[in-house]
A protein has these predicted regions:
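Metal-dependent phosphoester-hydrolase catalytic domains
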Residues: 175-185, 192-296
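Structured beta-strand-rich core segments of catalytic domains in phosphoester-bond hydrolases
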Residues: 55, 60-142, 146-150
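Extracytoplasmic/secreted cell-surface and envelope-processing proteins
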Residues: 31-33, 64-69, 78, 89-92, ...
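N-terminal, active-site-proximal structural segment of metallo-dependent hydrolase catalytic domains
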Residues: 15-91, 161-167, 181, 265-272, ...
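Acidic glycine-/aspartate-rich tracts in secreted/extracellular proteins
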Residues: 27, 62, 101, 249-251
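Extracytoplasmic, non-cytosolic globular domains
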Residues: 26, 35-45, 50-56, 127-230
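Structural recognition of the beta-strand scaffold that forms the well-ordered cores
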Residues: 20-23, 54-60, 81-82, 93-97, ...
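Sec-dependent N-terminal signal peptides
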Residues: 3-13
């Protein structure tokens, strides 16, 4: 009986100490001017609450004050922290986190990734990288979370810029590790448009991960977003743009066990080509992307 009680206590402590992290590009929250669509907030609330996350990185937040107000009303134990800069289109990024599980120690934004090799800038080019240092309140361990949103597009110019961003990130993380910042998570919209085709984009992205001993915890997930596919055939095509990767030390400290999950319309249609109607409200009125989570 005593051994069972000890085992039960160990399991409960393990469950408390573990974290569920995620990433979600919430397409131009809370109003997408390109599509003239206001974010369907009741649908978004259902999506976020169902994730049961402790920490989620978010992208394309055009109205940070509205997001903070929305989260406060729907998830009162959570807080929002976003970058001030959002690139040329004002798409800020950052984190939503559970204050009963995590304490935010420090938050900065890394502008160098906006224009690798050139002058970093806040209001043009790509988005910055959000950098949050968190403490797990149950274990007192600290880790760094990075949220990225790299250059979009599949043309040669977009690829060239994104390849420079991969190189920048490779050097950035190597320098960070040299400074002792070895336990970290990198997540977000890497915009790896060539990932499913296994083209040069996939190879450059993978090379960046390998150079830094980063493990992609979401390789088993078949997609993370949908787009029109280049033809007007009423069939939207899946793509794999978003990822959650971790450093070797973070994975070693937390244990190798993890479970990746895909959510939203991507899960609904199992990453197969589908019509906008089949993808449903989350695709039409919230985001083309789907949230993904990992329990570590």
């Amino acid at each position: 009986m005593k051994s069972l009680l000890v085992l039960s206590l160990m399991l409960s402590l393990s469950a408390w100490a573990g974290l569920k992290v995620g990433t979600y590009n919430i397409r131009n929250f809370d109003y997408d001017t390109r599509e003239d669509i206001h974010t369907n907030k009741p649908e978004l609330a259902q999506i976020l609450l169902a994730l049961k996350f402790d920490l989620i990185g978010v992208n394309e937040i055009n109205n940070g004050e509205e997001l903070a107000s929305f989260i406060k009303s729907k998830m009162p134990s959570f807080q929002v922290m976003l970058t001030k800069c959002g690139g040329g289109n004002g798409q800020t990024l950052g984190f939503i986190y559970n204050t009963t599980k995590l304490r935010l120690i420090d938050f900065t934004e890394e502008l160098g990734v906006t224009n690798p090799g050139g002058q970093p800038t806040c209001r043009a080019n790509s988005r910055p990288m959000a950098v949050g240092t968190f403490e797990n309140l149950s274990t007192k361990e600290t880790f760094i979370a990075y949220q990225v949103h790299l250059k979009a597009g599949s043309n040669a110019e977009a690829y060239e810029i994104r390849f420079k961003q991969y190189e920048y990130l490779k050097n950035f993380f190597q320098n960070a590790e040299a400074e002792g910042k070895t336990s970290y998570i990198v997540m977000g919209d890497f915009n790896t448009t060539g990932y499913l085709d296994r083209d040069q984009d996939y190879k450059k992205f993978s090379a960046m991960l390998n150079a830094n001993n980063l493990t992609n915890l979401t390789t088993s997930l078949g997609c993370s977003a949908y787009w029109w596919g280049g033809t007007d055939d009423n069939s939207e095509a899946p793509s794999k743009l978003d990822h959650i990767v971790v450093s070797r030390d973070y994975l070693t400290n937390k244990g190798a066990s993890h479970r990746a999950q895909l959510h939203g319309h991507c899960k609904k249609v199992a990453c197969k080509p589908a019509s906008s109607e089949d993808l449903g409200v989350s695709y039409q009125e919230v985001s083309d992307h789907c949230p993904m989570t990992v329990e570590i």
